[in-house]
Amino acid sequence: MARVKYGKVKVTRARRKRWIKLAKGYFGTKKSSYKKAHEQVIRSMAYAFIGRKERKRDFRSLWIVRINAAVRPEGLSYSTFMHGLKLANININRKMLSELAINNNEEFKKIVKQAKKALNK
């Protein structure tokens, strides 16, 4: 049988230790058993990748809900308001519109007024 050098053992141990370190905070054998930790970390990374994509969708829908809630008292729906903005040549993204609606309501009302004016032309 061939002799196994200690260097290979060190490399293997370091690799396994890396996976165990990534599994810190997991429950049960998923944090201590190499095989279970490795499987769970791979799965967790996949969920994290998906989550980063979903976060963008979630925030966009949140901004739309906020804009819609701010525009309804002015007598417009979200879609007609956005159409009015296009007609008025106002290029403000949804994130900024929702921030204006929450933090700077007077300025937002001015924008709504301009959108209404563009719709009536």
Curated annotation (Swiss-Prot):
The gene is rplT. It comes from Mycoplasma mycoides subsp. mycoides SC (strain CCUG 32753 / NCTC 10114 / PG1). Belongs to the bacterial ribosomal protein bL20 family. SUPFAM superfamilies: Ribosomal protein L20 (SSF74731). The keyword Hydrolase does not apply. It comes from the Bacteria. HAMAP family: Ribosomal_bL20. The lineage of its organism: Bacteria, Bacillati, Mycoplasmatota, Mollicutes, Mycoplasmataceae. InterPro entries: Ribosomal_bL20 (IPR005813), RIBOSOMAL_L20_CS (IPR049946), Ribosomal_protein_bL20_C (IPR035566). GO terms for cellular component: ribonucleoprotein complex; ribosome. One of its GO terms (biological process) is translation. Binds directly to 23S ribosomal RNA and is necessary for the in vitro assembly process of the 50S ribosomal subunit. It is not involved in the protein synthesizing functions of that subunit. One of its GO terms (molecular function) is structural constituent of ribosome. This is Large ribosomal subunit protein bL20. Pfam families: Ribosomal_L20. The keyword Mitochondrion does not apply.
